[in-house]
Design a protein with these regions (language model features):
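Conserved phosphate-binding/catalytic region of the ribokinase-like
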Residues: 134, 166-277
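Short amphipathic alpha-helix
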Residues: 24-31
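Short, solvent-exposed loop/turn segments at secondary-structure boundaries
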Residues: 15-19, 159-163, 212
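Conserved beta-alpha-beta core of the PfkB/ribokinase-like small-molecule kinase fold
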Residues: 106-170, 188
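Positively charged, low-complexity intrinsically disordered leader regions
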Residues: 1-16, 259-273
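Short, conserved phosphate/pyrophosphate- and ester-handling motifs at nucleotide-, phospho-/glycolipid
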Residues: 32, 151, 214-215
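Short beta-strand/turn micro-motifs composed of small residues
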Residues: 6, 43-45, 128, 150, ...
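Conserved N-terminal subdomain of the carbohydrate kinase-like
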Residues: 2-4, 9-19, 31-109, 114-123
Length: 277
């Protein structure tokens, strides 16, 4: 079983003309459920949120949840699928619930706008979800094996450094991480282990639906590493492949069981050899 901690938010995409209930927490939960993983989901929400989650229990027999009462339905609005969202209420006006305390063997945790938490577990994957004063895991959690997944801005904010050697020292020696992954959008990601670095490719897709792509990378990585027992390197590569399929088709696939993979790796163009007008 995997315990997922994260938000359940409303997402409005004007380009796709859609209003959906997802958020990082529930989208991660959805990926795991679609791949037959037993999931306990810890989130916040109002009566409508609880009704929505109960409806999903009718579809997924392996799904349980714990929902802390919260009046607001936090909303992310996108003008198009590559847009940065507008968040309502404003970040400064979002009230917080009492601290959530979760103890579980296996955890995938996403930073939440409306809640802080205390975590204790064996294997934990942590995604801070914000470059604005992201929480350090050492401030609220204990794990036997910890993997951070974050982007460049989040890594800089947590470590207060742009130097990769300082960043590595911080995560390995101060945060006691087993590994960390720094995502770089279309340029893929880098998996940092104590003894090596592994470039994780991105893939060329026919469609690019960016909304939720980071959630899928984190949740699928946790699935491959925790549930399927793959190595950190194989988990990261398969997470990137699952993300590519999600961005193209909005489906949740376990790529580790596929006989073939249809997408080509993206190679960064060498702009220094091009003439710019």
């Amino acid at each position: 079983m995997i315990t997922v901690i994260g938000g359940t938010y409303r997402e409005i995409d004007y380009d796709d003309i859609s209003i959906e209930i997802y958020g990082s927490g529930f989208r991660a939960t959805k990926f795991l459920l679609e791949n037959n993983c037993v999931v306990n989901f810890c989130t916040t929400g109002n009566i409508d949120t609880i009704k929505y989650l109960k409806e999903n229990q009718k579809v997924y027999s392996n799904f349980t949840f714990e929902c802390t009462e919260y009046d607001e339905v936090i909303t992310f609005k996108y003008s198009f699928s590559l847009d940065y969202p507008s968040i309502f209420p404003h970040l400064l006006n979002i009230p917080k619930v009492d601290e959530l305390k979760i103890e579980s063997e296996n955890i995938i945790a996403f930073g939440m706008l409306e809640a802080d938490f205390m975590l204790s577990g064996n294997k934990i994957v942590y995604d801070p979800q914000t470059p604005i004063k992201p929480k350090k895991f050492s401030e609220f959690g204990k794990a036997k094996e910890l993997v951070y997944i974050l982007n460049k801005n989040e890594a800089l904010s947590i470590t207060s450094s742009e130097d990769i050697e300082n960043i590595k020292d911080y995560f390995f020696n101060l945060e006691k991480a087993k590994a960390f992954i720094i995502k770089d959008g279309p340029f893929g990601a880098i998996l940092y282990l104590k003894d090596k670095e592994v470039k994780i490719p991105s893939y060329i897709t026919n469609n690019v639906n960016k909304i939720g792509s980071g959630d899928i990378f984190t949740s699928s990585f946790g699935f491959y590493w925790i549930e399927k027992g793959l190595s950190l390197e194989d988990s990261a590569i398969n997470a990137s492949r699952s993300t590519a399929i999600y961005c193209d088709k909005k489906v949740y696939l376990d790529t580790s069981i596929l006989d073939s993979f249809e997408y080509k790796e993206f190679s960064t163009p060498v702009f220094s050899e091009k003439q710019i007008y």
